Regions:
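Transmembrane alpha-helices and adjacent helix-loop boundaries
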Residues: 1-363
Protein backbone atom coordinates (compact mmCIF):
# COMPACT_ATOMS: atom_id res chain seq x y z
CA UNK A 1 0.00 0.00 0.00
CA UNK A 2 1.55 3.26 -1.12
CA UNK A 3 1.57 6.24 1.20
CA UNK A 4 0.52 9.48 -0.48
CA UNK A 5 3.04 12.30 -0.76
CA UNK A 6 0.57 14.64 0.92
CA UNK A 7 0.39 12.43 4.01
CA UNK A 8 4.19 12.25 4.23
CA UNK A 9 4.45 16.05 4.02
CA UNK A 10 1.73 16.42 6.66
CA UNK A 11 3.45 14.04 9.09
CA UNK A 12 6.84 15.68 8.51
CA UNK A 13 5.54 19.20 9.08
CA UNK A 14 3.56 18.02 12.09
CA UNK A 15 6.67 16.45 13.64
CA UNK A 16 8.81 19.57 13.10
CA UNK A 17 6.16 21.92 14.49
CA UNK A 18 5.55 19.57 17.44
CA UNK A 19 9.26 19.22 18.31
CA UNK A 20 10.00 22.96 18.21
CA UNK A 21 7.04 23.85 20.41
CA UNK A 22 7.82 20.96 22.75
CA UNK A 23 11.33 22.31 23.38
CA UNK A 24 9.95 25.76 24.20
CA UNK A 25 7.08 24.43 26.32
CA UNK A 26 9.43 22.16 28.28
CA UNK A 27 11.65 25.15 29.04
CA UNK A 28 8.62 27.07 30.30
CA UNK A 29 7.55 24.06 32.37
CA UNK A 30 10.97 24.05 34.04
CA UNK A 31 10.49 27.70 35.03
CA UNK A 32 6.82 27.77 35.96
CA UNK A 33 5.90 24.16 36.66
CA UNK A 34 8.89 23.14 38.74
CA UNK A 35 10.27 26.44 40.09
CA UNK A 36 7.21 28.69 40.17
CA UNK A 37 8.68 31.44 37.98
CA UNK A 38 5.91 32.96 35.79
CA UNK A 39 7.84 33.70 32.61
CA UNK A 40 5.45 35.91 30.63
CA UNK A 41 8.31 36.92 28.33
CA UNK A 42 9.16 33.56 26.76
CA UNK A 43 9.35 35.31 23.40
CA UNK A 44 12.56 36.98 24.62
CA UNK A 45 14.60 33.77 24.48
CA UNK A 46 12.90 32.43 21.35
CA UNK A 47 13.42 35.64 19.40
CA UNK A 48 17.00 35.87 20.66
CA UNK A 49 17.78 32.44 19.20
CA UNK A 50 16.06 33.24 15.92
CA UNK A 51 17.81 36.61 15.60
CA UNK A 52 21.12 34.81 16.18
CA UNK A 53 20.44 32.61 13.14
CA UNK A 54 19.66 35.70 11.08
CA UNK A 55 22.84 37.46 12.19
CA UNK A 56 25.59 34.91 12.84
CA UNK A 57 26.01 31.99 10.36
CA UNK A 58 25.65 33.90 7.09
CA UNK A 59 28.24 36.50 8.06
CA UNK A 60 30.69 33.86 9.32
CA UNK A 61 30.48 31.72 6.18
CA UNK A 62 30.71 34.77 3.90
CA UNK A 63 33.84 35.88 5.78
CA UNK A 64 35.45 32.42 5.73
CA UNK A 65 34.96 31.92 1.98
CA UNK A 66 35.35 35.53 0.88
CA UNK A 67 31.78 35.84 -0.38
CA UNK A 68 30.28 39.26 -1.03
CA UNK A 69 33.44 41.27 -0.43
CA UNK A 70 32.55 44.95 -0.42
CA UNK A 71 28.81 44.24 -0.12
CA UNK A 72 26.59 45.01 2.83
CA UNK A 73 25.19 41.81 4.32
CA UNK A 74 21.79 43.32 5.10
CA UNK A 75 21.30 45.31 1.90
CA UNK A 76 22.59 42.53 -0.38
CA UNK A 77 21.35 39.66 1.76
CA UNK A 78 19.69 37.67 -1.03
CA UNK A 79 22.76 37.62 -3.26
CA UNK A 80 25.17 36.80 -0.43
CA UNK A 81 23.06 34.02 1.09
CA UNK A 82 22.50 32.49 -2.36
CA UNK A 83 26.27 32.21 -2.84
CA UNK A 84 26.68 30.92 0.72
CA UNK A 85 24.15 28.16 0.06
CA UNK A 86 26.05 27.12 -3.06
CA UNK A 87 29.13 26.59 -0.90
CA UNK A 88 27.21 24.69 1.77
CA UNK A 89 25.60 22.35 -0.75
CA UNK A 90 29.00 20.88 -1.56
CA UNK A 91 30.33 20.66 1.99
CA UNK A 92 27.99 18.67 4.29
CA UNK A 93 30.55 18.51 7.11
CA UNK A 94 31.00 22.29 7.20
CA UNK A 95 27.23 22.76 6.93
CA UNK A 96 26.52 20.60 9.96
CA UNK A 97 29.39 22.21 11.89
CA UNK A 98 27.97 25.68 11.19
CA UNK A 99 24.51 24.47 12.21
CA UNK A 100 25.73 23.11 15.54
CA UNK A 101 27.97 26.14 16.17
CA UNK A 102 25.00 28.43 15.58
CA UNK A 103 22.93 26.49 18.11
CA UNK A 104 25.74 26.88 20.65
CA UNK A 105 25.92 30.63 20.01
CA UNK A 106 22.12 30.88 20.20
CA UNK A 107 22.21 29.09 23.55
CA UNK A 108 24.87 31.50 24.80
CA UNK A 109 22.80 34.48 23.65
CA UNK A 110 19.80 32.96 25.40
CA UNK A 111 21.78 32.63 28.63
CA UNK A 112 22.80 36.30 28.47
CA UNK A 113 19.24 37.39 27.72
CA UNK A 114 17.92 35.29 30.59
CA UNK A 115 20.43 36.84 32.98
CA UNK A 116 19.70 40.39 31.80
CA UNK A 117 15.94 39.82 31.97
CA UNK A 118 15.79 38.38 35.47
CA UNK A 119 18.61 40.25 37.22
CA UNK A 120 16.70 43.50 37.97
CA UNK A 121 13.74 41.72 39.61
CA UNK A 122 14.94 38.26 40.64
CA UNK A 123 14.56 39.09 44.35
CA UNK A 124 10.98 40.28 43.94
CA UNK A 125 7.80 38.25 44.28
CA UNK A 126 6.62 36.08 41.41
CA UNK A 127 4.07 38.59 40.10
CA UNK A 128 6.60 41.44 39.82
CA UNK A 129 9.17 39.09 38.29
CA UNK A 130 6.57 38.00 35.73
CA UNK A 131 5.84 41.62 34.79
CA UNK A 132 9.56 42.33 34.37
CA UNK A 133 10.00 39.32 32.08
CA UNK A 134 6.93 40.41 30.10
CA UNK A 135 8.47 43.86 29.59
CA UNK A 136 11.76 42.31 28.45
CA UNK A 137 9.90 40.17 25.93
CA UNK A 138 8.26 43.26 24.49
CA UNK A 139 11.62 45.06 24.38
CA UNK A 140 13.28 42.50 22.11
CA UNK A 141 10.36 42.75 19.69
CA UNK A 142 10.80 46.52 19.48
CA UNK A 143 14.53 46.06 18.87
CA UNK A 144 13.87 43.49 16.16
CA UNK A 145 11.37 45.76 14.42
CA UNK A 146 13.47 48.92 14.46
CA UNK A 147 17.17 47.96 14.54
CA UNK A 148 17.77 46.86 10.96
CA UNK A 149 21.44 45.72 11.21
CA UNK A 150 20.30 42.52 12.96
CA UNK A 151 17.62 41.05 10.67
CA UNK A 152 16.53 44.01 8.53
CA UNK A 153 13.52 44.78 10.72
CA UNK A 154 10.13 44.05 9.19
CA UNK A 155 11.67 43.19 5.81
CA UNK A 156 13.59 40.21 7.17
CA UNK A 157 16.58 38.29 5.85
CA UNK A 158 17.33 34.90 4.37
CA UNK A 159 19.42 32.52 6.44
CA UNK A 160 21.93 29.93 5.20
CA UNK A 161 20.56 26.46 4.54
CA UNK A 162 22.82 23.93 6.32
CA UNK A 163 20.81 21.03 4.86
CA UNK A 164 20.78 22.02 1.20
CA UNK A 165 23.18 19.14 0.46
CA UNK A 166 20.33 16.71 1.24
CA UNK A 167 18.45 17.75 -1.90
CA UNK A 168 14.86 16.52 -1.93
CA UNK A 169 15.35 15.02 1.51
CA UNK A 170 16.12 18.41 3.05
CA UNK A 171 12.99 18.63 5.18
CA UNK A 172 13.30 15.00 6.24
CA UNK A 173 16.87 15.63 7.45
CA UNK A 174 15.76 18.80 9.24
CA UNK A 175 13.00 16.81 10.94
CA UNK A 176 15.49 14.18 12.12
CA UNK A 177 17.85 16.79 13.59
CA UNK A 178 15.08 18.78 15.29
CA UNK A 179 13.42 15.68 16.74
CA UNK A 180 16.81 14.42 17.94
CA UNK A 181 17.53 17.70 19.73
CA UNK A 182 14.03 17.65 21.20
CA UNK A 183 14.62 14.15 22.59
CA UNK A 184 17.90 15.28 24.15
CA UNK A 185 16.16 18.22 25.84
CA UNK A 186 13.40 15.95 27.14
CA UNK A 187 15.91 13.40 28.45
CA UNK A 188 17.95 16.12 30.17
CA UNK A 189 14.91 17.61 31.89
CA UNK A 190 13.63 14.21 32.98
CA UNK A 191 16.97 13.44 34.59
CA UNK A 192 17.07 16.90 36.17
CA UNK A 193 13.60 16.80 37.76
CA UNK A 194 14.15 13.27 39.09
CA UNK A 195 17.38 14.33 40.79
CA UNK A 196 17.76 16.02 44.20
CA UNK A 197 17.94 19.32 42.32
CA UNK A 198 14.46 18.71 40.90
CA UNK A 199 13.07 18.06 44.37
CA UNK A 200 14.73 21.26 45.57
CA UNK A 201 13.07 23.23 42.75
CA UNK A 202 9.67 21.94 43.83
CA UNK A 203 10.43 22.83 47.43
CA UNK A 204 11.29 26.40 46.40
CA UNK A 205 8.09 26.60 44.37
CA UNK A 206 5.93 25.35 47.24
CA UNK A 207 7.50 27.38 50.05
CA UNK A 208 10.55 29.51 49.45
CA UNK A 209 10.73 30.65 53.09
CA UNK A 210 11.18 27.08 54.30
CA UNK A 211 13.78 26.48 51.58
CA UNK A 212 15.72 29.55 52.67
CA UNK A 213 15.56 28.42 56.31
CA UNK A 214 17.23 25.18 55.22
CA UNK A 215 20.13 27.09 53.68
CA UNK A 216 19.06 27.16 50.03
CA UNK A 217 19.94 30.26 48.00
CA UNK A 218 16.51 30.74 46.41
CA UNK A 219 17.52 33.81 44.41
CA UNK A 220 20.53 32.14 42.80
CA UNK A 221 18.61 28.94 42.04
CA UNK A 222 15.80 30.88 40.37
CA UNK A 223 18.30 32.83 38.32
CA UNK A 224 20.04 29.66 37.16
CA UNK A 225 16.69 28.10 36.28
CA UNK A 226 15.71 31.08 34.13
CA UNK A 227 19.10 31.01 32.40
CA UNK A 228 18.87 27.28 31.62
CA UNK A 229 15.29 27.66 30.37
CA UNK A 230 16.33 30.63 28.22
CA UNK A 231 19.08 28.54 26.64
CA UNK A 232 16.50 25.93 25.65
CA UNK A 233 14.08 28.57 24.40
CA UNK A 234 16.80 30.16 22.26
CA UNK A 235 17.70 26.79 20.74
CA UNK A 236 14.02 26.31 19.90
CA UNK A 237 13.90 29.73 18.22
CA UNK A 238 17.08 28.97 16.26
CA UNK A 239 15.64 25.67 15.03
CA UNK A 240 12.48 27.45 13.90
CA UNK A 241 14.52 30.00 11.93
CA UNK A 242 16.61 27.27 10.25
CA UNK A 243 13.44 25.38 9.38
CA UNK A 244 11.84 28.44 7.80
CA UNK A 245 14.94 29.41 5.80
CA UNK A 246 14.44 33.06 6.66
CA UNK A 247 13.54 35.33 9.53
CA UNK A 248 11.39 38.41 9.87
CA UNK A 249 10.81 40.34 13.08
CA UNK A 250 7.02 40.15 12.90
CA UNK A 251 7.15 36.34 13.12
CA UNK A 252 8.32 36.51 16.72
CA UNK A 253 5.60 38.07 18.83
CA UNK A 254 4.10 37.21 22.18
CA UNK A 255 1.00 35.35 20.96
CA UNK A 256 2.94 32.64 19.14
CA UNK A 257 5.92 32.35 21.47
CA UNK A 258 4.56 33.27 24.91
CA UNK A 259 0.82 32.67 24.92
CA UNK A 260 0.86 29.36 23.01
CA UNK A 261 3.55 27.77 25.22
CA UNK A 262 1.50 28.78 28.27
CA UNK A 263 -1.59 27.17 26.75
CA UNK A 264 0.41 23.98 26.16
CA UNK A 265 1.74 23.79 29.72
CA UNK A 266 -1.63 24.54 31.32
CA UNK A 267 -3.43 22.14 28.98
CA UNK A 268 -1.04 19.23 29.43
CA UNK A 269 -0.29 19.74 33.11
CA UNK A 270 2.48 21.77 34.73
CA UNK A 271 5.36 20.12 36.61
CA UNK A 272 4.92 17.04 34.45
CA UNK A 273 7.04 16.66 31.33
CA UNK A 274 4.83 13.91 29.91
CA UNK A 275 1.86 16.20 30.42
CA UNK A 276 3.64 18.86 28.39
CA UNK A 277 4.24 16.29 25.64
CA UNK A 278 0.52 15.46 25.56
CA UNK A 279 -0.41 19.15 25.65
CA UNK A 280 1.97 19.93 22.79
CA UNK A 281 0.56 17.07 20.73
CA UNK A 282 -3.03 18.21 21.33
CA UNK A 283 -2.13 21.83 20.53
CA UNK A 284 -0.25 20.86 17.35
CA UNK A 285 -3.06 18.58 16.15
CA UNK A 286 -5.61 21.33 16.77
CA UNK A 287 -3.58 23.99 14.96
CA UNK A 288 -2.79 21.72 12.01
CA UNK A 289 -6.44 20.69 11.71
CA UNK A 290 -7.60 24.31 11.51
CA UNK A 291 -4.81 25.22 9.05
CA UNK A 292 -5.71 22.38 6.68
CA UNK A 293 -9.48 22.85 6.84
CA UNK A 294 -9.80 26.64 6.96
CA UNK A 295 -11.62 26.85 3.65
CA UNK A 296 -14.12 24.18 4.67
CA UNK A 297 -14.72 25.83 8.06
CA UNK A 298 -15.08 29.38 6.69
CA UNK A 299 -18.83 29.13 5.82
CA UNK A 300 -19.66 28.07 9.38
CA UNK A 301 -18.09 30.98 11.29
CA UNK A 302 -19.37 34.59 11.27
CA UNK A 303 -15.85 36.08 11.18
CA UNK A 304 -12.55 35.65 9.36
CA UNK A 305 -11.44 32.06 9.86
CA UNK A 306 -7.82 33.11 10.55
CA UNK A 307 -8.95 34.07 14.08
CA UNK A 308 -10.57 30.71 14.75
CA UNK A 309 -7.56 29.06 16.38
CA UNK A 310 -7.02 32.05 18.69
CA UNK A 311 -10.66 32.01 19.75
CA UNK A 312 -10.98 28.26 20.29
CA UNK A 313 -7.65 27.83 22.07
CA UNK A 314 -8.44 30.80 24.30
CA UNK A 315 -11.78 29.21 25.18
CA UNK A 316 -10.02 25.90 25.79
CA UNK A 317 -7.61 27.59 28.20
CA UNK A 318 -10.50 29.12 30.16
CA UNK A 319 -12.37 25.81 30.36
CA UNK A 320 -9.25 23.95 31.48
CA UNK A 321 -8.70 26.49 34.25
CA UNK A 322 -12.33 26.18 35.35
CA UNK A 323 -12.85 22.42 35.27
CA UNK A 324 -9.41 20.77 35.27
CA UNK A 325 -6.77 23.25 36.47
CA UNK A 326 -4.24 20.45 37.02
CA UNK A 327 -4.19 19.72 33.25
CA UNK A 328 -4.63 16.51 31.28
CA UNK A 329 -1.89 14.71 33.24
CA UNK A 330 -1.62 16.12 36.78
CA UNK A 331 1.65 16.53 38.63
CA UNK A 332 2.91 13.31 40.19
CA UNK A 333 5.20 12.73 43.19
CA UNK A 334 8.88 12.88 42.37
CA UNK A 335 10.11 9.37 41.51
CA UNK A 336 12.70 8.04 43.93
CA UNK A 337 14.28 4.62 44.44
CA UNK A 338 11.90 1.72 43.90
CA UNK A 339 10.81 -0.30 46.95
CA UNK A 340 12.92 -3.25 45.80
CA UNK A 341 16.08 -1.16 45.34
CA UNK A 342 15.48 0.70 48.61
CA UNK A 343 15.10 -2.58 50.53
CA UNK A 344 18.28 -3.93 48.94
CA UNK A 345 20.13 -0.73 49.88
CA UNK A 346 18.98 -0.92 53.53
CA UNK A 347 19.97 -4.59 53.80
CA UNK A 348 23.42 -3.89 52.36
CA UNK A 349 23.96 -1.00 54.77
CA UNK A 350 22.83 -3.03 57.77
CA UNK A 351 25.10 -5.91 56.74
CA UNK A 352 28.09 -3.55 56.64
CA UNK A 353 27.32 -1.90 59.98
CA UNK A 354 26.60 -5.16 61.91
CA UNK A 355 30.25 -6.37 62.11
CA UNK A 356 31.30 -2.93 63.34
CA UNK A 357 28.66 -3.08 66.08
CA UNK A 358 29.74 -6.58 67.14
CA UNK A 359 33.38 -5.46 67.26
CA UNK A 360 32.50 -2.58 69.58
CA UNK A 361 30.58 -4.95 71.90
CA UNK A 362 33.68 -7.18 72.23
CA UNK A 363 35.66 -4.29 73.65
Amino acid sequence: MEVSAGLIIFVRDFAIFFAIYLIIALSLNLEYGYTGVPDFGKVLAVAGGAFTVGFFPGRIIAWLFGIGSGLDYITDNTAIVTDVNKVLMGTPAISIAIFLATLVVAGAIGAVLGLVACYPAIRLREDYLGMTLLAMGEAIQVIGYNYTPIIKGNLGVLVPDPFGWAGNLRYAVIAVFIIGICLLVFYYLERLVRSPLGRMLRAIRDNENVSESLGKDVTRIRMKTIIVASIMGSIGGALDAFKAGGIIATSYQRVSWTFWPWVIVVLGGSANNMGVVVGTFAFTAFRRFIDYYKEQLAPFVPFNVVWLDLLLLGMMLILIQMYRPEGIIPEKPTPTLSHKRLKKFIISKSAVSRPEKEEKELF
